[in-house]
């Protein structure tokens, strides 16, 4: 007996390892290296294509709670992340090359996982299968899925540029974490005064963008979690100053004042020789990226080792298609996992892979599938993507808004987060004891 897993991204890797850890053989299909998508840069598995940040570590935060739940479910990728984390204040950021290498080595060294490096164009019939083909599902498989379900939605994600550390002019920058969190040098901050910001802003909104297929270049449909900086800027001159360039919590030690606007740079790898432009996912043409981003004083001589790109993203109308256990409503041997289900974010995708893998095993063993309690973050996201009352389905990442309200809701935001997390982890522990 074996279970098929299609795709070796974050969700597929988690699903495969959950299945193998239960003693069931896995046939894992991955089209790389024979075929790649526009956003992929390597032949490795679990490739992080948008950012190297896995979001907040604090268990009292929604993102931190999600990761703690994953740890308690024996997450393979959380172990990989912990082994290659880089300083990032209160966030868990990783060296993405090492992260993908660890994931790839773990998968390929597992005796129960047989990897087939080939493109899948049709989902195997009469076999238990987890489809984790991702937001960059190949066109033949995407078309097969569309024919199977009659509808799907598409939009675009964007990735931020990366510059070399040595090309950052520290005469115009300073090291600090917002509100003095972390070790103090986790971020390089590139301040701008009002005049510099206005010059940059006007250049940004008028810069030429790369062409997109099946999408309006001037106003593409994008999701908030990875919105191109030029699209965000179109909303108004102050939008960036209240978004990725917000100066709050930062004081320029050279002036003693808070800057008008700040671009933060975060370490891309453990070596600290590359930095990514935080929140600056973009679809500008490469020469335009060089021209516009070099208007930021600290980046006037920046060496761009990778320019930002924008790529297609496809997801299901999951409330009409999936159950909360990630199985298809009319086919309990077929599961979907990852961003194709409408969960938004790296760890959210990985978490859905954990659940799909567990439930695929339970079907193989003749057991009933499980859904975690809806007061856990993973359980709440599982409920969200399968909520048939949702009329216009949009992707969702971890946030406390998807959880049931607290009985005694603290007024203080931090206390409220701690209460949500304490309740969730207690609920998860109790649930896991009974299965």
Regions found by a protein language model. Give the residues of each.
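A glycine-rich dinucleotide-binding beta-alpha-beta segment and adjacent secondary-structure elements
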Residues: 277-281, 285-343, 350-352, 370-386, ...
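Beta1/beta-strand and adjacent pyrophosphate-binding region of the FAD-binding site
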Residues: 1-11
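Helical element adjacent to the flavin cofactor pocket in flavoenzyme catalytic cores
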Residues: 96-115
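Dinucleotide-binding Rossmann-like beta1-alpha1 core, especially the glycine-rich loop
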Residues: 47-57, 82-98
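N-terminal FAD cofactor-binding segment of flavoenzymes
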Residues: 17-79, 374-385
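Predominantly flavin-linked oxidoreductase catalytic cores and closely associated redox partners
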Residues: 109-266, 271-286, 290-291
